[in-house]
């Protein structure tokens, strides 16, 4: 259900390349730079989910060194009114040239098979088509998906009895074919929602899908969940307990929406939590201010949260923002950021002082809390929501997956004291499970954070 970014190429009138495997991802990136230089244009290389998450052996080829060129000033590239009109002419001329190129380039290729059925496709859908049909259909593969060829499509259509477009999401190729007078089948057969697979395509066309090959080992499912010992867990438990409206942001903490926490109410894009909360509270007034918060990670805050809290402070919005400082950019693979004190190479670098920054933009109420201390977290949240001014709570504890973080020994369960009440299960830790009427701790996952111990009223969980 990813966005169909092909629309951007059409709206901006810039070429788009769509690789269908790992090798093409490499080759098309090279071609993108070549086309950019030749046609003086940005080029989009569209990577869909399956291409990005797949891997295969690639042939690298010989590295080409590009000589540096002197920078030359060109005031016509500044889009003032007088220049924008000239630029529009250049864009239209470039589009005509790129369309002519699309007719002859090897990026768009025809693979003739049985002529009873012709299929036009692109991206990962091409791989599914080849797996389902093999030589039982002729295929026009569009590696350059915008601008699309006109004559090439018409010529291909003339060589087959029936023409079908197989593409994920929107009917963009299908609509193009109809606009140039080529009759095709498309979304009346192929789903518009969710990603395609070999099975989806086969069943959509009334064919029998190949059976899945089952793994010999029965691997248990792994639903999206915050890691055992994640410092965000105590924050979201506290927010859920206090029935807060939580405006989320982009990061591991987006998983706060998952059960049993069910703590997140809104999530749009990086930085939207702070400015969104500000607008929400301005619109809702005092009724909303006392139970609404924004949550944003330290790296997302450095990326685009600072302007949002500046707006809150400047307008004296009675809003509470929680900055979840786990000392790293967690979700995308532990990259450094301006709050960690190291650059992307791991070298010492300047470090943003979050408390000082928040005070500098106008917050008088700034406090730091350890999120694994549930009582302290609850106290801080209640006090800041009750305050009649903007406030910041910095939830500070390193990501448990950092190599520098020492894990405590796993906890144990006193089975004589445990009555299976399930209170500890409310934090949603993957190291905890109910086996029969008793709680069980997975010692391979437990990092001894002791958050669950604070939930147990019978002292049944022990370090």
Mark where each language-model region is:
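Short, glycine/polar-rich helix-capping loops at beta-to-alpha or helix-loop-helix junctions
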Residues: 1-5, 127-129, 148-152, 173, ...
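Short secondary-structure boundary/capping segments
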Residues: 3-7, 59-64, 135-136, 179-181, ...
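Short glycine-enriched loops at secondary-structure junctions
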Residues: 1-3, 122-125, 249-252, 325-328
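Flexible, low-complexity linker and terminal segments
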Residues: 19-226, 231-235, 240-244, 248, ...
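Thiamine diphosphate
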Residues: 257-394, 405
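Acidic-glycine-rich active-site phosphate/pyrophosphate-binding loop
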Residues: 5, 243-258
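Conserved thiamine diphosphate
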Residues: 1-42, 48, 82, 290, ...
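Glycine/charged-rich beta-loop-alpha catalytic/anionic-binding loops adjacent to active sites
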Residues: 10-18, 219-221, 254-267, 286-292, ...
């Amino acid at each position: 259900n990813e966005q169909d970014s092909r629309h951007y190429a059409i709206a901006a009138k810039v070429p788009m390349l769509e690789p269908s495997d790992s090798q093409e991802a490499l080759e098309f990136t090279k071609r993108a730079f070549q086309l950019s230089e030749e046609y003086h244009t940005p080029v989009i290389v569209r990577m869909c989910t399956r291409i990005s998450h797949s891997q295969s052996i690639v042939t690298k080829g010989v590295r080409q060194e590009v000589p540096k060129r002197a920078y030359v000033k060109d005031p016509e590239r500044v889009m003032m009114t007088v220049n924008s009109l000239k630029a529009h002419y250049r864009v239209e001329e470039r589009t005509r040239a790129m369309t002519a190129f699309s007719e002859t380039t090897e990026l768009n290729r025809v693979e003739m098979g049985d002529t009873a059925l012709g299929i036009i496709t692109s991206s990962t859908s091409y791989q599914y088509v080849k797996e389902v049909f093999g030589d039982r259909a002729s295929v026009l593969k569009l590696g350059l998906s915008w601008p699309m060829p006109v004559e090439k499509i018409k010529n291909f259509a003339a060589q087959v009895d029936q023409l079908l477009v197989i593409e994920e999401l929107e009917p963009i190729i299908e609509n193009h074919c109809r606009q140039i007078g080529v009759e095709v089948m498309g979304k009346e057969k192929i789903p518009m929602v969710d990603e395609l697979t070999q099975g989806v395509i086969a069943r959509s066309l009334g064919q029998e899908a190949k059976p899945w090959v089952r793994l010999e080992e029965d691997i248990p499912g792994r639903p999206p969940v915050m890691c055992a010992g994640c410092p965000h867990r105590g924050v979201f438990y506290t927010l859920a307990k206090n029935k807060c409206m939580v405006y989320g942001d982009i990061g591991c903490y987006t998983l706060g929406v998952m059960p049993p926490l069910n703590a997140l109410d809104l999530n749009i894009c990086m930085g939207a939590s702070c400015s969104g909360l500000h607008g929400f509270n301005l619109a809702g007034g005092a009724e909303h201010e006392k139970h609404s918060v924004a949550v944003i990670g330290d790296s997302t805050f450095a990326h685009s949260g600072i302007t949002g809290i500046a707006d809150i402070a400047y307008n004296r919005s009675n809003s509470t923002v929680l900055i979840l400082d786990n000392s790293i950019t967690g979700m995308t693979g532990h990259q450094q950021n301006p709050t960690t004190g190291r650059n992307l190479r791991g070298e010492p670098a300047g470090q943003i002082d979050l408390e000082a920054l928040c005070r500098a933009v106008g917050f008088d109420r700034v406090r730091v809390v350890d999120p694994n201390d549930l009582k302290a977290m609850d106290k801080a949240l209640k006090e800041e929501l009750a305050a009649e001014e903007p406030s910041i709570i910095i939830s500070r504890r390193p990501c448990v997956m950092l190599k520098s973080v020492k894990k405590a020994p796993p906890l144990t369960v006193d089975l004589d004291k445990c009555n299976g009440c399930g209170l500890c299960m409310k934090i949603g830790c993957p190291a905890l499970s109910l086996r029969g009427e008793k709680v069980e701790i997975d010692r391979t996952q437990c990092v001894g954070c002791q958050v669950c111990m604070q939930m147990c009223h019978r002292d049944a969980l022990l370090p």
